[in-house]
Regions:
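Ligand-binding pockets and gating/stacking loops
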Residues: 1-289
Length: 289
């Protein structure tokens, strides 16, 4: 909570604001939600996150971060890469590059986003790092990796096909100045072949017990979507995937893709979003411990 908001609640801003012709500035408002301290750390948590509050001592809360860009694309890019205009490696790419992965049959960096957020793929891009370190985006948990299996070829035929493609790509690479994308393409073909057996099992949530699914809120329509994402994150991490990044943006409408970007009805919007994400996050923290 910001004590200055309490101090200036209902008053004009105590500093000069830019002249806005279309939208005149309103008065300062304090948060409509109450906060109280939790855990041995005494960290303030909003009443909207009662489940997460019980895990506050397991969290690293950083309140010193700032952003320089108020626009969707630039702000999202800065949050993920540290840069708001130029291409830079994403945080997930840096982690994968520095720490490697423990599973050679699944991507080392997986992004789960029912709908792509503002800016899209650059948020998990590897930029000047080798292309193999970019994230793999999953939008549909029921069909996580599109075109993964080739129903017209058996495994032996696919293996011969991949070997031929690899030879052709290596030949082309030897004639090319830029080899990074070709190396990544060769590696992606090999990974896709191995994923045909590993991915279906990893992404199948049906084998999880009823108790586990209830822990994540999958039995409740309010928390089901993000609960499934959080449960998938646990399954991927325990199988050696180094980085899993989740986006809470379940709607397919233009305004719904950025459901945390409320321009109006703030109290209702935040209440709905917190209700949909609180229990799944707490369930993941409980399960990881």
């Amino acid at each position: 909570p910001n004590p200055r908001l309490e101090e200036f609640d209902g008053k004009p801003a105590p500093f000069k604001l830019p002249n806005l012709e279309r939208t005149p500035p309103g008065k300062i408002r304090k948060s409509p939600f109450t906060f109280r301290r939790y855990g041995e750390s005494g960290i303030d948590v909003s009443e909207m996150f009662p489940h997460v509050a019980r895990h506050v001592d397991d969290l690293c809360v950083i309140r010193s971060m700032v952003a320089d860009n108020i626009n969707h694309n630039g702000a999202c890019l800065q949050m993920n890469t540290g840069e708001q205009t130029f291409s830079r490696p994403s945080m997930g790419s840096w982690l994968l590059y520095g720490l490697g992965t423990e599973n050679q049959n699944l991507p080392g960096f997986v992004v789960v986003a029912p709908n792509q957020p503002a800016q899209g793929a650059p948020l998990w891009d590897s930029s000047f790092l080798p292309a193999a370190y970019q994230g793999t985006c999953v939008t549909d948990l029921k069909q996580p990796i599109t075109n993964l299996a080739n129903s017209s070829l058996d495994a032996n035929s696919q293996r011969r096909q991949l070997d031929l493609l690899a030879r052709l790509n290596r030949f082309h690479r030897n004639q090319s100045v830029s080899v990074d994308e070709l190396d990544a393409r060769i590696a992606s073909f090999e990974l896709a072949f191995r994923m045909q057996s590993a991915a279906p099992e990893a992404f199948d949530l049906s084998g999880e017990s009823k108790i586990t699914q209830e822990l994540y809120g999958i039995d409740d329509t309010v928390t089901q979507t993000f609960g499934e994402q959080c449960l998938l994150a646990r399954r991927l991490v325990e199988r050696g995937v180094r980085v899993v990044q989740l986006y809470h943006n379940r709607s397919s409408t233009a305004s719904g893709c950025q459901i945390w970007d409320q321009h109006s009805n703030l109290k209702m919007g935040l209440t709905n979003n917190c209700a949909a994400s609180d229990q799944p996050i707490a369930g993941l923290l409980t399960d990881l411990k």
